[in-house]
Amino acid sequence: MIKRIQIPDILQPVSHYCHVVEANNIIWISGLVGMNYNNSIPENTKDQFDIAMRDFDTCLKAAGGDFSSVTKVRVFLTNIDDRKIINPKRIEYFGEHKPASTLLEVSALVDPRMKVEIEAEAIKLKWAW
């Protein structure tokens, strides 16, 4: 069975998708950006990353996971040099857990003010080892 989860407390999708899909104890989280609930976007990458990670945490919990259950994360940056900013922040969120990871520089995100987007896969905690 496929379960789709829309999270009312985070930025709502701007297209035809949902925040989280869960099937067979696998969790897929759609791309999350650093836009606040009031549609404001901080100017700096660190604050945008923190907003995206806050929403990421909300999505994980709604699907029965947490940061320790993440198996793969993809981070999209509009400036690859910003990895120096987000790498220490990733350690704050993930701690000793090291999921598989891909970091990509992209020419643009959905809004030209956006600097970072995160998407991921995880497993439900009851299946985590």
For each feature predicted by the language model, list its residue ranges:
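N-terminal presequence-like segments and the immediate start of the first folded domain
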Residues: 1-71, 77-129
